[in-house]
Amino acid sequence: MSMTPREIVHELNRHIVGQEDAKRAVAIALRNRWRRMQLPAELRAEVTPKNILMIGPTGVGKTEIARRLARLANAPFIKVEATKFTEVGYVGRDVESIIRDLADAAVKMMREQEIQRVRHRAEDAAEDRILDALLPPARQGFGDEPIAREDSNTRQLFRKRLREGQLDDKEIDIEITETPSGVEIMAPPGMEEMTSQLQNLFSSMGKGRKKTHKLKVKDALKLVRDEEAARLVNEEELKARALESVEQNGIVFIDEIDKVAKRANVGGADVSREGVQRDLLPLIEGCTVNTKLGMVKTDHILFIASGAFHLAKPSDLVPELQGRLPIRVELKALTPEDFERILTEPHASLTEQYRELLKTEGLNIQFAADGIKRIAEIAWQVNEKTENIGARRLHTLLERLLEEVSFSAGDLAADHSGQPIVIDAAYVNNHLGELAQDEDLSRYIL
């Protein structure tokens, strides 16, 4: 990952509108990882990531920034809710399961990459197995060279027909390695590790057993291709690489961190919120967690915590946790101009998604500039009057706005015969105007 912070921000701008401070902070954090890897080994071990605390209302892009960052870095990533965890001793998940889940995500990511790498070899091997089932090898006989050549020519002809899909519906008998059926084990919260070990034990029983199936060629080809790809992947090497990737590149996003802050002057039931924070301390500071991959050191995993902090303040977190989240970034609430940009600027924007979805039914819709402006204004107004859910309000508005069009898309396509339906300000006011003005209606519908 050798992108500069400026390039990282430019890439994030393709998907997220505004929030420049947050983008700069995560871009620097990601670049510092690359810088650290260029250092001598002795100094590299001493440089730890500067963890980030994002503060801002819901729906402004906190989670999306972290998710896009992980995709850019091609790094193991996991998003967790702080409220799902409890202090050790209470019923609920303990915080170490975060690292176990991150390790599972790393293995899955590495396996997908490795399967992609060996895909062509797996396809060739799968083709050969299918051809063996279609054309059993000729018996060896005296002076069989011409037969072998003829067999080779026939095989190439069948290979060509196979690749062109002419044999897809032909049925063959083929031997497939059976996948052990998984055993679902219900266990109380906090015992995930034991459950995982039991599931692994049961799934290993009967592993490698083969069975002959009668399948169509196109179905058999997919199964055999997956089997050959799995055979070409070196599991031990894959796990070693996944372990290194978790330790050096892992990113953990902890949402709703404000919900485990103990608010000042608030009494009542409290299932040890402060205890969850104290359990998070060693994880963020650096400790060793036992996982299926082995012992994972968390010293160089990047932690990004986020919260709205409506009721609590960042200073309500325990001081030790505040110290372990040194970079503070405040994300701003969205303005009508931001909503307007969200509807048009990002790659695969909402308006583009709806346009392409309806195009599949032959219906052409166009969003006029004044229509987009009016949608943005209504989204902002409803957020101000009711709960502020940020950009998520646009999903609700657009679903409501295009409900009739989506329901009757096939009929409308026939009626308009290629002419576009224009979503302008008048159309928006006609479908959303009254709902936006009536606070009681907008509270329940928008």
UniProtKB/Swiss-Prot annotation:
Organism in which the protein naturally occurs: Azotobacter vinelandii (strain DJ / ATCC BAA-1303)
GO cellular component terms given for this protein: HslUV protease complex
Signal peptide boundaries: none
Keywords: ATP-binding, Chaperone, Cytoplasm, Nucleotide-binding, Stress response
The protein's name: ATP-dependent protease ATPase subunit HslU
Binding site for ATP: V17, G59, V60, G61, K62, T63, E64, D255, E320, R392
InterPro entries recorded: AAA+_ATPase, ATP-dep_Clp_protease_ClpX, ATPase_AAA_core, Clp_ATPase_C, HslU, P-loop_NTPase
CDD domains: RecA-like_HslU (cd19498)
Annotated SMART domains: AAA, ClpB_D2-small
A biological-process GO annotation: protein unfolding
A Pfam match: AAA
This protein's encoding gene: hslU
Locations listed in the record: Cytoplasm
Species lineage: Bacteria, Pseudomonadati, Pseudomonadota, Gammaproteobacteria, Pseudomonadales
Record-stated family: Belongs to the ClpX chaperone family. HslU subfamily.
Record's subunit section: A double ring-shaped homohexamer of HslV is capped on each side by a ring-shaped HslU homohexamer. The assembly of the HslU/HslV complex is dependent on binding of ATP.
Physiological role: ATPase subunit of a proteasome-like degradation complex; this subunit has chaperone activity. The binding of ATP and its subsequent hydrolysis by HslU are essential for unfolding of protein substrates subsequently hydrolyzed by HslV. HslU recognizes the N-terminal part of its protein substrates and unfolds these before they are guided to HslV for hydrolysis.
Keyword Cytoplasm included in the entry's annotation: yes
GO molecular function per UniProt: ATP binding; ATP hydrolysis activity; peptidase activity; proteasome-activating activity
